[in-house]
């Protein structure tokens, strides 16, 4: 597609039609800001999380994983500053009852207190805490208040000493976590980009003070390289450094990797130098010593600085779909049937790796195709489709991003060969059935996006 311009409407339509994402509770009219991941969506989401997890805990010897509880002691959120500071400015329209983030309104509307929807009068701005508050146990008084975690990072900080002791970790080292977080957003919008329930992929890297700038630069490079590795077009990515007015209260420096979504450049992932703020606060509030003892350097004691990489998993899913989406003219016959919709996922990200397609259902081709699929599914996520013309079946696989199709025809019965089709180029090669698995693995290893 020229300049790769797409609309969010096309993305949403494709996601629902092909089983990537559905509106939550749709039969009841839908729950605003909540989404369910369908058969292809969950495969895509799992592949993105596996790629990130491999990058962190497998390719780095000094990073380990954690799965902390969603419900944490409420003092955690007092120490982190969330109870006091995790707020957005809120205004209401007295007439139409719409709610707005004050900092997202046009300045003239906010200054004149005029609703942008109906022209009614806006209320004064007030702070709105984004944490979901609930109660634990049989009572619902202040003693039973608990929060759904608004971020996964604090679960890492409170386990930092446990992991040092149990895994004999030495600084510098990191702790990675993928998990759900919850924020009572004033406005949820742009499909799965901003929702109240979402998943984060966060890594907290503990370093000696004075080395933090060096590690900050290292992780900036690492995180940019991750998106390049999985085929994201770098002309759609940019860095945004937080100005002094944007920096969080705990941050020494912060950069966002932004992606050009249909609604413009928006944050995809943040790399933050959180200094020793979090561990210092948890020391104060818990009474526990969070200092690191450097046994290799004369038992020197210090509270580590933390370099954080924080990405939204669900936001990454949207990014990979948007970045992969393409519409391509495949013939010059002057009608709409000559266009195909294709998702150009990296093969390691694609929800289906290979589809097996018998040319016909009869004459034993379907049975042979099932045999081949059974061989392939030991190695790859596979699909099987025997309905309709072969060209339409190719198009269906293109639309969900399947990088390889294997066609089983009458020659396959005679000489034990199959046709391997490539999604991006639509080229086809004839290869022996016995070489199919090794050829697909080689193609995945050497994959380079051409569009």
Swiss-Prot record:
Biological process terms in GO annotation: glycyl-tRNA aminoacylation
Record's subcellular location: Cytoplasm
Residues the entry annotates as binding substrate: 101, 151, 198-202, 308-312
Lineage: Bacteria, Pseudomonadati, Spirochaetota, Spirochaetia, Spirochaetales
Transmembrane helix is among the record's keywords: no
The gene coding this protein: glyQS
One protein family per Pfam: tRNA-synt_2b
Quaternary assembly: Homodimer.
Chain positions recorded as ATP binding sites: 183-185, 193-198, 267-268, 312-315
Signal peptide range in chain numbering: none
Family per similarity comment: Belongs to the class-II aminoacyl-tRNA synthetase family.
Name this polypeptide is given: Glycine--tRNA ligase
Record keywords, A-Z: Aminoacyl-tRNA synthetase, ATP-binding, Cytoplasm, Ligase, Nucleotide-binding, Protein biosynthesis
Natural source organism: Treponema denticola (strain ATCC 35405 / DSM 14222 / CIP 103919 / JCM 8153 / KCTC 15104)
GO MF, one example: ATP binding
Keyword Ligase found: yes
